[in-house]
Each structure stands twice: as structure tokens, then as C-alpha cells.
Amino acid sequence: MSAPIVFHSLAALAYSLLAVVLWRRFATSQPTVQVGQLARIGLLAAIVLHGFALHQSILLDQRLQLSWALALSTAVWLGMIVFWLESLIIRIDGLQLLLLPAGAASCLLVALFPKEQLVAHAVDPAVRIHLLAALSAYGLVTIAALQAILMSAIDRRLHFPMAAAREAKGLGIVIGRILDAQPPLLAQEQVLFRVIWIAFGLLTFAVLSGSLISVAATGKWLPFDHKTIFTLLSWLTFGILLVGRYTRGWRGRIALRYTLLGFAFILLSYTGSRFVVEVILQRS
């Protein structure tokens, strides 16, 4: 078993253990502050382990290797870093409970599908900067999508209290505690749009830098393929959302729907399409 697979498996185990600890805190009503501090330190350790696993997998001498699973894992890892930094300002444990399983799953996928491809022209610093910007944007969009799911659940609980009361049995009780312990929706919405603004900026930079690289390599501004189309659709979706937010004050369910739609497009732009090609169609 190769070192990258071992480290990705260890990172998946670390994320899983943290998820269990955090879940048990809500299930048994343990003291929030004490467990929260330990969880933050544990999450930082897991992020460092995950980052080392990615370093071992992606960097090969002066070349770069990437696959759909590695791209997803890198995006989630970058999202984890952003979440950890955000947690120093505002604690959103419900989002962490969504992120930890996502982190574990992304690491396991790398271990299960270890096939990588060399990235063309990876020695060019411009290509590396473009990849970093694109993957950072993917990671931030992933964070935004998971937060949108959490906010949708909180919104439903607030608007349909009778339905929430009927579901308050067993697992529903723990989920109710988790949702009730989250910051107000207004505070979460501010965090959500801050993340979306940064993601949109990085996505814009990735599109522009990708265009310049394409012109230098092929003479074309943008290749007409699924990756370009879905990336532009995601960029357009988030652009419309931000314009609507500024001009019409869009928020709440409209903002959440646009966020999830933009995430769906960004997921299809590389990870989804490469999964179909590499796993289902068995092509490199």
C-alpha cells in the first residue's frame, strides 16, 4: 500500500472520529466549551494530516498529478481550512458535522480510486496558480453549499415547528439540538455571502487565467468542452445571485437555491465529468 493511500486513510479516520465525538456531544449534552476546544485542535491536526496526504499524492518531482478524487479531496481540504479560520470568529458546529463526513468521504475516495493523471504544463507557474485558484474556489463553493443545506434545515425548523415537534424522537432529538445550537440565520447568512464573494472572485480569476493559458497554448480563448461550460454556468449563477443580493436584497430561500445550483454546476465541471470518464467509462 502506497504512502498517499495510507495517509488519506488516516485522515479519513481522523475526520470520522471527530464527527463521532461532536455527534456524541449533542447526543449526551456534554459541556460545549470544553469539547469545542478539543474538537478545534483535533480538526487542525486532521487538516494537517490531510494536507500531507495531498502533498504526497499530487506532487511528483516537479510535476503535478491530479484525478477527480484528488480534485474533490483538495477542494474539501481547502474548504476545511476556511471553515477552521471562520470558526475562530463564529462557531457553526452544525456545518462542521456536515464537513467532517465530507472530508472523510473525500479521503476514502482517493484511497479507493488512486489512479492519477499528470497535469499538462504543470511546470509553468501560471498553470499552478490557475489550479490553486480553481481548487480554492471549488472548496469555498463546497463550504457555501453545505452551509446552505444547514440553513435550509434551520429555516424549515423555524417555519414548521409542529412538524419539528412530531420528528422529535430518537435521532430527531439530536438533530433538533444541533439545529437549535446554531448561530442566528442572519449571522450565518453574512458568513455565507462572505464566502460566496471570495469564491466568486477566485472563480473569476480562474476563468480569466484559464483563458490566457488557453490562448498561449492553443490560440483559443476558451476550449468548448463540458468543464468550461459548467464552470461558466456556475460563475454566471453566483454572479446573478450577488447582483440580486446587491440590487434586490435577495436572501433566504432564493439565496440558498442559487448557492446549491452553483455548487451543482461546479461539481459537474470537473469532478463529476472526470468520474464518468475515469470510473464509469474506464478511460484515462
What are these regions (language model features)?
Residues 8-30:
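N-terminal signal-anchor/start-transfer transmembrane helix
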Residues 268-284:
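Juxtamembrane boundary at the C-terminal end of a transmembrane helix
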Residues 33-43, 69-71, 93-104, 255-260:
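Cytoplasmic-side transmembrane-helix entry/capping segments in multi-pass membrane proteins
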Residues 60-140:
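Membrane-interface helix-loop-helix junctions at boundaries between adjacent transmembrane segments
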Residues 42-57, 108-111:
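A generic, lipid-embedded transmembrane alpha helix
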Residues 1-15, 137-141:
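Hydrophobic transmembrane alpha-helical segments in integral membrane proteins
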Residues 67, 212-240:
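Short alpha-helical packing/oligomerization segments
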Residues 243-264:
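Interfacial loop-to-transmembrane junctions
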